[in-house]
């Protein structure tokens, strides 16, 4: 019975539910899009290219593993944890003998993969270029289509796609920047793969040259294993697993027959789809990044959606106050009213959820493509679209709508029928403002109390608002103590949402306080100003529903746009203050080769090579840099606060104050870490420095880091010299792509890289902001559309169309001022706490012009969303509206 009535009610009130439908549909689309990113991170396929012809691949373990054992209440709990390392781990070449003796093995092919960037104007078409030995071409396989195989150290075979793009053929010369100095090679042949290779460019060298460039003597990247005739891939995998498994395997390593089985100390055996992550390490790491991005976006979207949709349903229930009061008067129980509104919301939420989920699927694909274009996600991780994200969005939308309706219906379903009718009468006619105020003053004491309660705050709402406000303050306080970006970023946006939610609950009180402040200036604008003031004061609940999404929009936008500059400016300032060098040598390619630094030193320049990596201390990740110790204090000043950099060697390290605090280190202490390629190292701390934000948490010796990274080329070279820029350029002229920059120009280059990283965050939160902007327009339009009868009575009382529209503009601008103050205040508090935690100073980077633009956009949205429905409402004759039945 109640469901049938709810269906008829929705059918009869299609226009009234339009606002809620749009909000819910946008929320479902956003949740679905975020869900597809999360699904891709969890289940996305990484298709192998290089190892397509090798059904089984043996490679090194790409994880740092830790096992913890806890004894509690007579029980022993063992936990196994693993975190990925930043660089490629290598296997001993001697393992080939063991593999070759394994039953069912026809051939074992050692693989070497290393940096090999061809220096041509045509480039590689956005593909990453790798070097290999021609002996491993059978892994794909590649076959010669013209020319001959490489035999001499100067010979080179290139793939056909690159040859066509660069217009190269056998006999041509090609300069390649690999891990050593750039070298000119003679192209002896062109090869083509027999399977699709879409995400990389391959260059094949002679066996000896490949070993030299790989720079890991006695080690290989992986082994491709080809089965003997009649041996299946599964049987081959099982045989190799059995052959390689050692009794001394670490606790927690997998020995079951799974597609990926870590064995012994380093080796792992992979087959099927598990070969892809072995080949594309960045794609495997991107899984974690996508799960993080999708989860953060989805969680924020859900919180914002609930906040916005509750406001939408509050307005919807207010518009139906007279109808619901009448139902209460004719014996409808509180439970029946709640069930009616809840089922209406479920109907609207389900329909909107289906439509939004269908829209969210292409939106998720667009988001994935944008992340790929920005470099945040490699194209090798294939986008996955399953049934779970749209289904989850549908359920979340329907439940969100039902919850919002229950929250919005709490008061109307609880008050007595006579009181409901009295309030509905008080809110009728011009009772949007002055009328309601007059009726309140004229009523009895009990009536005045009830009407004031309706226009203001209930005790429960006030208490909930204060609790959330306190929660927001706690989050801000916690944020000021967080000193790592991964920890502080989610808390930053959560604090904005929680504080905005407290604004939603305390909104009526805030609106009334704002009216007291603005009453004087607004009243000076004439009768329309006085009427606008009365409307704002008399309809604080309705105006609060409008203020909430606008506050969230301004607060969230300011936070998103100013978080990265706050961090980037502080890091840039530390970098500028810490670079003592006269010049900085950088490269447009993969890096500055060591030979360039040697040539500068040969001319008596003071040179510091800088190579960057990421290491693990335990399972925690730290940014590290390797620097050449000789003459270091002439080119670099990290503001040492304890110890000295004079003792920096391959057996020692310097740490930032943050790392020293987290790891409880001081000069003379021992630092145990895992280098980028998984190699453990034990170092002695010789110095602690303050400028960790600009230079990383750990500083090691250059040679130590360079031996354990995929790209040993220097990211920059600091040069202290009396020579001019022109003289340095002349010295380095034989190194293509190398540039000599002033320290300020190098800082600008670093700023551009940070901007590229910031664009990922802008995109991640941009859709949430777009949804919030839609909610602002939707809520304002609903608020104005509700007041058709009020506008008609004002016109019958003598007001002109222009005066009514001016009143609406004054109301909208008043709401914008309040929302701008609240949103900006929330953003300032959150950004200040973020700045204190991350930089140690309460100095958020806020660009005044950008802030003014944000407020101006919010004002424009408010004015347009008010003017359009207002003009539409005023087109109908006032007498017709005033005499029509509600």
Language-model region placement:
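Membrane transport/envelope proteins' first extracytoplasmic loop
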Residues: 3-306, 315, 689-767
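Small-residue-rich transmembrane alpha-helices
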Residues: 313, 346-376, 389-414, 474-479, ...
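Alpha-helical transmembrane segments, especially those used as permease/efflux helices
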Residues: 15-18, 289-292, 392-405, 428-563, ...
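Interfacial "coupling" helices/loops that link adjacent transmembrane helices in transporter permeases
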Residues: 9, 13-16, 307-350, 415, ...
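Juxtamembrane segments of multi-pass membrane proteins
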Residues: 493, 497-499, 503-661, 667-670, ...
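Short cytosolic juxtamembrane segments of multi-pass membrane proteins
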Residues: 413-440, 446-452, 874-886
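Membrane interfacial helix motifs at helix-loop boundaries and amphipathic/re-entrant anchors
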Residues: 37-53, 253, 260-261, 273-303, ...
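Alpha-helical transmembrane segments
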Residues: 4, 12, 16, 26-72, ...
